[in-house]
């Protein structure tokens, strides 16, 4: 957990629990908060280590990265911290491979084995939601496996590619579609799913890569006239209109046009 001077609002993290720290927990929380930056919390199974750390987050009020040594424990911690902090951006970031077979060569039989992978679509969505939360919020807890140490590309380039939409914005439909392509969204007029968009006249529907919702954009040929959040399956409006909306990349590996030219 970082102890750097991070500017954040008071009571940004709100711990929700019917229980209070008991036994050795209050002393452990106090020492973890006041002690050196690098410490180890030891405890038997069921002693409330996760609850203790939730109280540390509540006290320090700082964005937190929690690294687990495997995906199973990371999933358990993710659910527990979501229960403790239902109003905050608790995110899940682990490897999205259900199966990974690296390429290999067997000299004894002169056999080449091609690389084979199977990506979990739900985990990919949660990974994108984690990085989107880091760009848009301060009250972020990321529960991760060691996959978080690997490079995802430049966060500067990732942030530059954000598509900012607003009702009344003067932009052509073709410019919007070009920017969606830059964000790695693909056009799919007949199979609308996560990370795609479809075009019907002056209406553009965008199925967000990091949420279970979609955005409907209405254009009059010169400017955006309406922004709505819709259900991606039924296409029905989710009861309210938007004034502004930012669209974040559909994939982590993003290169700006200048870098693509190079």
Segments and roles (model prediction):
Residues 2-262:
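ASCE RecA-like P-loop NTPase motor cores
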């Amino acid at each position: 957990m970082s102890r750097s001077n991070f500017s954040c609002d008071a009571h940004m993290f709100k711990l929700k629990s019917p229980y209070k720290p008991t036994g050795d927990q209050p002393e452990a929380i106090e020492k973890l908060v006041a002690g050196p930056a690098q410490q180890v919390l030891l405890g038997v199974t069921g002693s409330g280590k996760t609850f203790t750390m939730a109280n540390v987050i509540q006290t320090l009020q700082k964005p937190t990265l929690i690294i687990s040594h495997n995906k199973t424990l990371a999933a358990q911690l993710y659910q527990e911290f979501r229960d403790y902090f239902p109003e905050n951006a608790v995110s899940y970031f682990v490897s999205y491979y259900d199966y990974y077979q690296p390429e290999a060569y067997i000299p004894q039989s002169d056999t080449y084995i091609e690389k084979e992978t199977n990506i979990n679509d739900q985990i990919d969505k949660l990974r994108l939601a984690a990085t989107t939360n880091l760009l848009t919020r301060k009250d972020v807890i990321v529960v991760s496996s060691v996959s978080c140490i690997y490079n995802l590309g430049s966060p500067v380039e990732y942030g530059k590619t954000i598509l900012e939409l607003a009702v009344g914005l003067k932009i052509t439909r073709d410019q919007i579609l070009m920017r969606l392509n830059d964000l790695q969204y693909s056009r799919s007029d007949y199979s609308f799913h996560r990370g795609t968009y479809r075009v019907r006249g002056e209406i553009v529907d965008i199925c967000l890569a990091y949420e279970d919702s979609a955005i409907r954009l209405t254009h009059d040929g010169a400017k955006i006239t309406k922004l709505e959040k819709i259900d991606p399956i039924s296409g029905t409006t989710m009861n309210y209109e938007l004034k502004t909306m930012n669209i974040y990349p559909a994939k982590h590996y993003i290169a700006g046009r200048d870098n693509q030219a190079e």
